[in-house]
């Protein structure tokens, strides 16, 4: 997932004969072309000074993909606590520069809701992944088998 949100190459590090093709295909189209974002994922400002490592909040990172002039936002939340504690946390879409409620896909859960914040309750080393649609669009548009459901059409 993080490689797919890196806006760069995706390297497969599995041993020969042990690659899970289903996971690899989440990063690319059938022809092998990567489904890329505009820029690499980056932590939100409030996560830059150690709060996730201290177990005070989840590590939230975002990337965007611009397609046909619309901006799709991809958000990953990871529990990186060094104390290995369960963390309940939320992130307002306003903190990402997104105004008002949006259609949000919980990619792992396969559910779509309309909300103005993302929430996660994660065990140590667990992760959540969300797709936030542009205003007026549904987050479950696109290819839901892929990490980048609506890839960028920017060069």
Model-flagged regions — what are they?
Residues 1-138:
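Active-site-proximal substrate-binding groove within the catalytic cores of carbohydrate-active enzymes
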Residues 134-155:
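Accessory, solvent-exposed terminal regions and/or long lumenal/extracellular loops of proteins
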């Amino acid at each position: 997932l993080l490689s797919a949100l890196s806006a760069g190459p995706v390297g497969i590090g599995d041993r020969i004969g042990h690659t899970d093709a289903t996971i690899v295909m989440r990063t690319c189209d059938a022809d092998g072309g990567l489904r890329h974002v505009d820029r690499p994922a980056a932590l939100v400002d409030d996560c830059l000074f150690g709060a996730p490592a201290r177990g005070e909040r989840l590590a939230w990172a975002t990337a965007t993909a611009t397609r046909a002039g619309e901006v799709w936002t991809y958000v990953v939340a990871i529990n990186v606590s060094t104390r290995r504690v369960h963390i309940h946390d939320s992130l307002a879409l306003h903190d990402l520069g997104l105004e008002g409620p949006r259609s949000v896909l919980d990619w792992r859960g396969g559910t779509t809701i309309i909300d103005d914040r993302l929430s996660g309750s994660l065990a140590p080393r667990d992760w959540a992944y969300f797709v936030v649609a542009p205003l007026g669009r549904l987050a479950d548009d696109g290819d839901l088998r892929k990490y980048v459901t609506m890839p960028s059409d920017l060069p």
